[in-house]
From Swiss-Prot:
The gene is Glyctk. One of its GO terms (biological process) is protein phosphorylation. One of its GO terms (molecular function) is ATP binding. Pfam families: DUF4147, MOFRL. The modification N6-acetyllysine is found at K200. The lineage of its organism: Eukaryota, Metazoa, Chordata, Craniata, Vertebrata. InterPro entries: GK-like_C_sf, GK_N_sf, MOFRL, MOFRL_assoc_dom, MOFRL_protein. This is Glycerate kinase. It comes from Mus musculus.
Length: 523
């Protein structure tokens, strides 16, 4: 189970025990109690997708210890096992794999986020750490979720190991969210800096994770099936913790063990769509021009078994169960929340108002116009309308507090130079939406957090807000509009109520996208 979430001023180092909520203010009591419960639910979601237990449920040895069973497949072990991995959850996955398979493990290389070993040690998570004399070499890199020289060294070491394997060898590949940044190996003559700049430009213009990964794969030696190709003819078992909506194998960490289905024309279409084709470096044009003659063909991945071992849906199911234990009527709306963060925030604001009206039908007329807009917006965001309608009907029948859960990965179009992440920006936008008009005698809280514990280039997982955000920010002379225009949500939440609305978890050792909680509690 993940360490209990802590909420504390962002400029302080997270202590080993939860920090108290700060000065006792009577009118804040109910909000703080709700926030404590929301943090418990977020913590339970993260705890459900810890890497070790998930890997242990997937792998098993026969009584002789000479056969490895993975789902319905069996592999012979003859001290012929090699291991590579990359991602935010891979340290714990590798530790679990080593515990089970150490006698057969010849060599391993993993690429994990900078500082994660120290963070796990500090949190007392010994089960997430490799043994002192492990055969697995650990590289830490990709500081602030960005590929760097350390991650490049790790990727090239992984490539070298894979290319040295034979038909008698077995390669266990561990993949989780964050793996793409931790496995950068640009095709020469493209440099890491050129590839990183192109990715940054695309992200700033609102490119989806699928579009970003299409470009990354086209310019990478290892993504888009490249790692599988490098390991051929060895057998490859790829265990994947999904951080992508719908769990598409070819998208998670840019699909290093899955043949790419995208062509150069797909890449050019994306670059044209975001107005970047004319600005491409000569090296990128060179690689794209010759890519069609040397694709990672489907035939190169027939020796690979890809297995999803965990996802956002598993995390939300556990949060729902815990919410019901706490006395909430809890429902999961979607595990596919995506789209522009402003539209997603508008959806949650409308949902809160419509749900509040359903909870207090005697005090307000049903907001038919807003309910119609809610359904239209759900369609725009590709959310199941039937599921939304069933949730609203359940809210209307509820005789107590309600918790609506969702997961996914909205996108932010960067237009300023501030500091923040999509979870903090979403929370700030939702806070504005909640304050547009009174919600009646109901306390409403919204929380958005990244299950990896790192929201963008910050040291926090996300943030939470209530419907009094606008008035409280005004009382503290904080300008929400300017913060949003400058994409400066982190700075805002650092200053707002002394940083107590930020979610501090530290690196969690896992990653299954984001968790959103909307709590409605009748007063």
């Amino acid at each position: 189970m993940a360490a209990a979430l802590q909420v504390l001023p962002c400029l302080l180092r997270a202590p080993s025990r939860p920090l108290l909520w700060g000065p006792p203010v009577a009118r804040m009591t109910s909000g703080m109690a709700l926030a404590e419960q929301a943090r418990q639910l977020f913590d339970s979601a993260v705890g459900a997708v810890q890497p070790g237990p998930m890997l242990q449920r997937t792998l098993s040895l026969d009584p002789s210890g000479r056969q490895l069973k993975v789902r319905d497949r069996t592999f012979q072990l003859r001290e012929n096992l090699y291991l590579v991995g990359f991602g935010k959850a891979v340290l714990g996955m590798a530790a679990a794999a080593e515990e089970l398979l150490a006698q057969h493990l010849v060599q391993g290389v993993i690429s994990v986020p900078k500082g994660i070993r120290a963070a796990m040690e500090h949190a007392g998570k010994k089960e997430m750490l490799l043994k002192p004399h492990s055969r697995v070499q650990v590289f830490e890199g990709a500081e602030d979720n960005l590929p760097d020289r350390d991650a490049l060294r790790a990727a090239l070491t992984i490539q070298q190991l894979a290319e040295g394997l034979t038909a008698d060898d077995l390669l266990l590949v561990l993949i989780s969210g964050g793996g793409s940044a931790l496995l950068p190996a640009p095709i020469p003559p493209v440099t890491l800096e050129e590839k990183q700049m192109l990715t940054k430009l695309l992200a700033a213009r609102g490119a989806t994770i699928q579009e970003l990964n299409t470009i990354r794969k086209a310019l990478s030696q290892l993504k888009g099936g490249g790692l599988a190709q490098a390991a051929y003819p060895a057998q490859v078992i790829s265990l994947i913790l999904s951080d992508v909506i719908g769990d598409p194998l070819e998208v998670i960490a840019s699909g290093p063990t899955v043949a790419s289905a995208h062509s150069v024309q797909d890449c050019l279409h994306i670059l044209n769509h975001y107005g970047l084709r004319a600005a491409l470096p000569r090296s990128v044009k060179t690689v794209l021009s010759r890519a069609d003659s040397d694709p990672h063909g489907p035939h190169t991945c027939g020796h690979v078994l890809n297995v999803i071992i965990g996802s956002n849906s598993l995390a939300l199911a556990e949060a729902q169960r815990q919410a019901e234990v706490l006395g909430y009527h809890a429902m999961v709306l979607s595990t596919a929340m995506q789209g522009d963060v402003k539209r997603v925030a508008r959806f949650y604001g409308l949902l809160a108002r419509v749900a509040a009206a359903h909870l207090t039908p005697s005090l307000a007329e049903r907001p038919l116009e807003e309910e119609a807009e809610l359904h239209q917006l759900a369609a725009e965001l590709q959310l199941p309308d039937l599921q939304l309608e069933e949730a609203l009907e359940a809210v209307a029948k509820a005789k107590g507090p309600v918790c609506l859960l969702a997961g996914g990965e909205p996108t932010v179009q960067l237009q300023g130079s501030g500091k923040g992440g999509r979870n903090q920006e979403l929370a700030l936008h939702v806070g504005v939406e909640l304050g547009r008009q009174p919600l009646g005698p109901i306390d409403v809280l919204f929380l958005s957090g990244g299950t990896d514990g790192q929201d963008g280039p910050t040291k926090v997982a996300g943030a939470w807000v209530m419907s009094d955000l606008i008035s409280q920010a005004s009382a503290e002379s904080l300008d929400i509009a300017t913060s949003l225009t400058n994409n400066d949500s982190y700075t805002f939440f650092c200053r707002f109520r002394g940083g107590t609305h930020l979610l501090h978890t530290g690196l969690t050792g896992t990653n299954v996208m984001d968790v959103h909680l909307l709590i409605l509690h009748p007063q």
